[in-house]
């Protein structure tokens, strides 16, 4: 594959303060030192298809493997798209070049790019055939492991909706929601993109209605209310859920407000929109500025009484704020200039999408994102977990991760999970980095926990949990293993040795 830097990983705003000494602290693979990447010091290589959670895992990872139905839909996305936006042979031939041109407008030439670029037919075609397709893959893998609080009659809103990418991803990822009577406010500054998106969504519904019929079910397309406007525009109904995907990435680069001011404004608007027990799902590119912004919004929502449901395994200070906010007086370990983001490898993505990406010189082996899911419902379930105990021989690997259960079984599962957690007397931690080598023959992964910023370590061998765990894995670590005074000298993370 091409090594061309993907859009969401290339466009990185420089931090105001210089980075801390020791570049090996970075989470990015390309910033690792030769010592870290030396093959002689690494354990035997593990194939990408073998990198999965093992029995030590407790809880579901951030990303789920694509289900058979989801993979089929994503493989046939060009056919669904062709019903709304047919391309003749000449336009198909020009598509890779148009994608490459749009990529440069969204990155290198961003300052000169028009805000309403999706009103341009050529750019809309390039955007939907490349960015929408990739975003569907990202979102479907993420949404499979998030249990959204939606019921019959609910109103929800997706801001920066564009061609309804999030709505389409949710329809693909959550077949159990297809029978619910939901109304979605889809808000965007481009009316043409919204109209196009509604047609695309209906074409998707027609496709799943033909290929995914299940006994005793009747899929009904959700009611779409298109709203031409920006985040903050008044809506008629209070919302059970507010979502956005990549909207703020279009806003805060050119906003006169600081990130802190933008986060405060976001909190204020969210509180206007939501019902008392409403929830918020914000998804952004996996870049430092987006991670920093989401960390600030999370802090604002926690002050309003929200629970940080995912990906956070705790409701304390964010461990990855992408700034130096260590509370030295309290001794809380916080990462310096590291941000919360998660990656997945793309080998199970549609092959035609991978080929199109290569043709546009935008091939990628991995994709990433940052997100927060917060709920005002105190009973909201944080980090769904398997019903088997961590370390049990029956614990499922990531390739067979459990998907959200029907509502009728939700209470039963929560009870089992609470009992499981109590029996283990452990601390849930979320792996938030690639593999590093903090010492010879030692593997390390940075992690988030209620105890703060952690550096998990194991001996460097092929079957090490840190070598096999995927990004976003949730582990259950014995509380006795976390000694706050045992710190890494460079990063000040709490050192946690695992077997």
Kindly give the residue locations of the regions a language model identified.
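A short SAM/SAH-binding and catalytic strip from SAM-dependent methyltransferases
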Residues: 240-259
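S-adenosyl-L-methionine
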Residues: 196-235
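N-terminal auxiliary segments of SAM/dcSAM-dependent transferases
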Residues: 3-23, 29-111
């Amino acid at each position: 594959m091409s090594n061309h830097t993907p859009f969401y990983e290339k466009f990185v705003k420089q931090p105001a303060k210089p980075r801390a000494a020791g570049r090996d602290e970075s989470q990015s693979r390309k910033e690792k030192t030769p010592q870290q990447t030396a093959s002689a010091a690494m354990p035997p290589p593990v194939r990408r298809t073998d990198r999965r959670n093992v029995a030590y895992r407790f809880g579901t990872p951030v990303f789920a493997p694509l289900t058979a139905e989801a993979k089929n839909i994503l493989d046939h996305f060009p056919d669904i798209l062709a019903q709304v936006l047919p391309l003749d042979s000449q336009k198909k031939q020009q598509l890779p070049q148009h994608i490459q041109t749009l990529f440069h407008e969204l990155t290198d030439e961003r300052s000169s790019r028009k805000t309403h670029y999706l009103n341009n037919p050529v750019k809309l075609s390039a955007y939907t055939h490349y960015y929408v397709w990739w975003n569907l893959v990202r979102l479907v893998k993420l949404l499979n492991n998030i249990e959204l609080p939606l019921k019959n009659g609910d109103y929800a809103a997706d801001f920066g909706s564009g061609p309804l990418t999030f709505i389409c991803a949710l329809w693909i990822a959550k077949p159990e929601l297809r029978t619910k009577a939901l109304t979605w406010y889809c808000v965007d500054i481009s009316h043409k993109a919204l109209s196009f998106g509604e047609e695309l969504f209906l074409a998707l519904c027609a496709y799943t209605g033909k290929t995914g019929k299940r006994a005793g079910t009747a899929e009904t397309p959700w009611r779409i209310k298109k709203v031409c406007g920006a985040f903050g525009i008044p809506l008629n109904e209070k919302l059970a859920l507010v979502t956005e995907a990549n909207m703020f990435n279009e806003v805060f680069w050119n906003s006169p407000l600081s990130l802190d001011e933008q986060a405060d404004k976001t909190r204020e608007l969210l509180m206007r929109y939501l019902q008392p027990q409403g929830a918020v799902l914000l998804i952004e590119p996996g870049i430092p500025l987006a991670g920093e912004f989401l960390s600030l919004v999370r802090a604002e929502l926690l002050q309003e009484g929200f629970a940080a449901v995912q990906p956070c395994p705790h409701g304390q200070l964010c461990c990855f704020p992408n700034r130096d906010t260590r509370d030295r007086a309290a001794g809380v370990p916080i990462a310096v200039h590291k941000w919360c983001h998660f990656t997945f490898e793309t080998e199970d993505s549609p092959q035609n999408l991978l080929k199109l990406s290569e043709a546009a010189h935008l091939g990628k082996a991995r994709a990433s994102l940052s997100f927060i899911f917060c709920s005002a419902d105190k009973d909201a379930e944080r980090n769904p977990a398997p019903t088997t105990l961590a370390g049990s021989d029956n614990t499922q690997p990531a390739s067979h991760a459990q998907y959200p259960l029907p509502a009728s079984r939700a209470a039963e599962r929560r009870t089992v999970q609470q009992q499981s957690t109590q029996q283990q007397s452990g601390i849930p931690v979320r792996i938030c980095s690639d593999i590093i080598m903090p010492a010879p023959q030692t593997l390390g992964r940075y992690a988030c926990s209620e105890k703060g910023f952690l550096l998990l370590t194991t001996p460097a061998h092929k079957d090490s949990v840190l070598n096999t765990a995927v990004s976003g894995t949730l582990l259950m670590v014995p509380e006795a293993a976390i000694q706050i005074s045992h710190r890494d000298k460079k990063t000040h993370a709490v050192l946690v040795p695992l077997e």
